[in-house]
Curated annotation (Swiss-Prot):
Record organism: Homo sapiens (Human)
Gene3D superfamilies cross-referenced by the UniProt entry: P-loop containing nucleotide triphosphate hydrolases (3.40.50.300)
Gene from which the chain derives: IDNK
Lineage: Eukaryota, Metazoa, Chordata, Craniata, Vertebrata
GO terms of molecular function: ATP binding; gluconokinase activity
Biological pathway: Carbohydrate acid metabolism; D-gluconate degradation
Coiled-coil intervals: none
NCBIfam families named in the record: therm_gnt_kin (TIGR01313)
Protein name: Probable gluconokinase
Amino acid sequence: MAAPGALLVMGVSGSGKSTVGALLASELGWKFYDADDYHPEENRRKMGKGIPLNDQDRIPWLCNLHDILLRDVASGQRVVLACSALKKTYRDILTQGKDGVALKCEESGKEAKQAEMQLLVVHLSGSFEVISGRLLKREGHFMPPELLQSQFETLEPPAAPENFIQISVDKNVSEIIATIMETLKMK
């Protein structure tokens, strides 16, 4: 596989996606997006009330993120995206657009899209106990710790043929960044 045009830092809430993604983008000199910043207000309210999002909530949000990634990568900008992307279908939407879902992504059907976006998925994984402990310490986030169990239930960890690496959140942030950088050197 060619070097990725984009990196997806994924995992459940509290896995460190935003922290790792922002530091990684800074280290690489790539553009950084935090998918949480693109949730519609309705999604934020729903999660704030402790109601898990369903596919109908997530698909328009993922399509929007796909369109942003596609525009940047097509213009030569390399990107790091921090996004839960819990299901393979969600990761497919990020790389391929609306294929396989009932909703059309704005950019997906345009002729400028020559091929599937080259994406390296970085799955930050950890136990429920470790991650729930992190969430309990976090302040000011719209995602309440009570929704973590539903995220673990929804999670479909990446598997072949996806282009991915899995890194334990038991490592410190600098070890995680070093592992990702080493992986990129091999691509």
